[in-house]
Structure formats: C-alpha cells, structure tokens
C-alpha cells in the first residue's frame, strides 16, 4: 500500500499518532498536520529526517480512505493507516506524540457529561494500549475527547493504577487535556463584539484572552480582565461574552441541527497545540508556554511541578485544573498559579467557586470509573 511505512524510515522520524483520525475532528486535524507540519522541519535538524503521521480508527474502511487521500498531498509528511484489523500497536510504536480525538460526538441536548460512560470506556482502552506500546518516559498524550474534565483523570488514573511500569515514568506530567478551543473562542468573540460595538477599529490581529478552569460550561473561566485587548465593554456585554465562551459548543451543535458538533474549530485548536509539541521535540524551541488541563499532583501525591503547591489552595485542592504551564521535553515544569491571584473580584468570588465545585465532581466521576473498572477486572 502507498501509505505504509518501512521500519528504517520510522526510526528517523518524529511520529505522531492520531487516535480517532477518521472522525470529524480527526480528519480535519490530520489534514492540517499533513499540510502544515513541513514548516517545522529545519535543515539544521539532522536527528529527525521527517515527520510521520500514524492514523488510527476503528472504522477500517474510513481510515484507509482518509489516509490514501492525505497521502496524495504534496508535502514531505508521511502517513500510514491503522485499524483494529492490523492492531493499534503498529500505530503507537515509537510515537512521540499521541493525540486523541476518538469518541462519540455530542448530539442535541447532550452535555459533555452525557458522553462520559461511552467515552470513558474508549479512553481507558486507549490508555491501556499507550501504556503497553509507548515509551512512558517520553511520550506526550493530548486528550481532545470529551468530557475532558473527567476523561483526563480517567487516562492518568488508569495508567498509573493498572500499569506498574508507569509509576516512575513521569507520564502524569505529559498527559494533558486540550482546552485550547475555549481560548480560541474567547479571542474570536471578544474581537467580534468590540468591532460590532464600534469600540475598536477592525485590525488584523487577535486578542489574547486567558481561559482557565475546565472545559465544560461554568467550569470554563474566561479571564477577559487579563486580555491584552483594551476594551470598554459594559457589564451586559461581558456577561454575554462569558456565557458564549462557556456554551460555544452548544451554539455549533444547534447550528448544525444536531448533525454535528464543533469539529473544524476544534481541529484548528488542536493543530495549534500539536504544532507546539512538534516544535519542542524537534528542538526548534526549548519550552512551551500554554494552557492545558493537567493533574496538579504526581504519582506520589506531591505537587506536579513548581507552582502547583501554590495553586492547590487557591482552587480548594482540586486535583486537576486548566492553567498556563511551562512545558519542556520532560513535561510540565512550571505552573503559573499567579494568574489566579490576578483575577478580578467577579472572577475570583463568583466564577472560581462555581468552577471548582463542578470540576471536583467531574474529576471524582473519572476517578470512580477507574476504581470500579479496576475492581471488576
């Protein structure tokens, strides 16, 4: 097949595994990566000759078609197709980055939490495969599947509890929930309302808006007070913006009449994250500064990195939180807890308590799932 890869090529490549690559997010994300990652390759980097995309999906016919289609694109990024028929092992072997958009999509009336039981089972199985096939001391795992608030705890807890080889690997520093779409939406919506209201002229730049907390409803805290985009929004406009960011996913589901969810914008957000990790692992940059949903404690129940010990009391001991991080090739190296100290009164006294209360329930749901799965196995 034209989209298979020889072992000798794989040895010299940076391998990215996309699990769920034939789905709505997976196809678009794979297209962006195939088309754009060539620009990360630099002539000065001789240790990696090229980038390889290993595309996996349970739908063999669909993933073979997607991979064949992508393989015709004129970039030096290689692609290979994988399904249960050939085994997920070939997809994950030697992968440096594993991206997971796998799972069932949202339908009308469904919240991210409604998806939990089905997607938690999928994430657990994929986590088992990652633990068995990947180098846990090096691999980065980016979880896109929803509900992120619960599924990242499922992934981390399942690997640490059920795979003894993970205990000293530091893998918990390299499993991250992708919440970038909330940041993308906050930036887009803020620029839009400022222009429509005549508060700012139309410019070809986008505002930076930090978004912390979780990735569902009121666990999402857009910090418009810390945006670099000067604004004179009134209270009603601000409330509208916050609600729109928190429930932007519902807006897309309704617009598609329940026949789809936010796939294109999520693929764009996912690409923006993956390209940073590719740049890091190629040596183009020394560290990443970005917001991800991560555990705040390591496998031994100590703070995951400097800054986590200061953040934990600020979020009432929540074990997972989306927060700006510094990330090196070893994983999370610093947690920017001070962003919470810089919140205004409304964000700190109204939004944060609601976020933390709901987030703890979401986290417990994930941990309970793993505990019950372990007990029944």
Curated annotation (Swiss-Prot):
Post-translational modification: Targeted for proteasomal degradation when cells are shifted to glucose-containing growth medium.
Keywords assigned by UniProt, alphabetized: Cytoplasm, NAD, Oxidoreductase, Phosphoprotein, Tricarboxylic acid cycle
Signal peptide residues on this chain, from the entry's feature table: none
Modified residues (Phosphothreonine): 6
Motif (Pro/N-degron): 2-5
Residues that coordinate or bind substrate: 106, 112, 146, 185
Main location: cytoplasm
Quaternary assembly: Homodimer.
Protein name per its UniProtKB record: Malate dehydrogenase, cytoplasmic
Organism of this sequence: Saccharomyces cerevisiae (strain ATCC 204508 / S288c) (Baker's yeast)
């Amino acid at each position: 097949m034209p989209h298979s890869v020889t072992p000798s090529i794989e040895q010299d490549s940076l391998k990215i595994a996309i699990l769920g690559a034939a789905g709505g997010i997976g196809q678009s994300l794979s297209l962006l990566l195939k088309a754009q990652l060539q620009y990360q390759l630099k002539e000065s980097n001789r240790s990696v000759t090229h980038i390889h995309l290993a595309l996996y999906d349970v739908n063999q016919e669909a993933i073979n078609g997607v991979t064949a289609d992508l393989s015709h694109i004129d970039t030096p990024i290689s692609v290979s197709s994988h399904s249960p028929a050939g085994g997920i092992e070939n997809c994950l072997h030697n992968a440096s980055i594993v991206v997971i958009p796998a799972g069932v999509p949202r339908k009308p009336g469904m919240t991210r939490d409604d998806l939990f039981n089905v997607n938690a089972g999928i994430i657990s199985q994929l986590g088992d495969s990652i633990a068995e096939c990947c180098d846990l001391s090096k691999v980065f795992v980016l979880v896109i599947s929803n509900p992120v608030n619960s599924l990242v705890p499922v992934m981390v807890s399942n690997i640490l509890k059920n795979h003894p080889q993970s205990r000293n690997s530091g893998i918990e520093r390299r499993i991250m929930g992708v919440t970038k779409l909330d940041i993308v939406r906050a930036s887009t919506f803020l620029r839009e309302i400022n222009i429509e209201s005549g508060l700012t002229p139309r410019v070809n730049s986008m505002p930076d808006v930090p978004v912390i907390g979780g990735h569902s409803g009121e666990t999402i805290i857009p910090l418009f007070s810390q945006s670099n985009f000067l604004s004179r929004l009134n209270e009603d406009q601000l409330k509208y913006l916050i609600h729109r960011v928190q429930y932007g996913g519902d807006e897309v589901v309704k617009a598609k009449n329940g026949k789809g969810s936010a796939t294109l914008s999520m693929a764009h957000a996912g690409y923006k994250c993956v390209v940073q990790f590719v740049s890091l692992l190629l040596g183009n940059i020394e560290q990443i500064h970005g917001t991800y949903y991560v555990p705040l404690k390591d496998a031994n129940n100590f703070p995951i990195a400097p800054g986590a010990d200061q953040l934990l009391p600020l979020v009432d001991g929540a074990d997972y939180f989306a927060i700006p991080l510094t990330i090196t090739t070893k994983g999370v190296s610093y947690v920017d807890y001070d962003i919470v100290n810089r919140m205004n009164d409304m964000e700190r006294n109204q939004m944060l308590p609601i976020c933390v209360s709901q987030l703890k329930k979401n986290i417990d749901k994930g941990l309970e799932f793993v505990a019950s799965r372990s007990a029944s196995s």
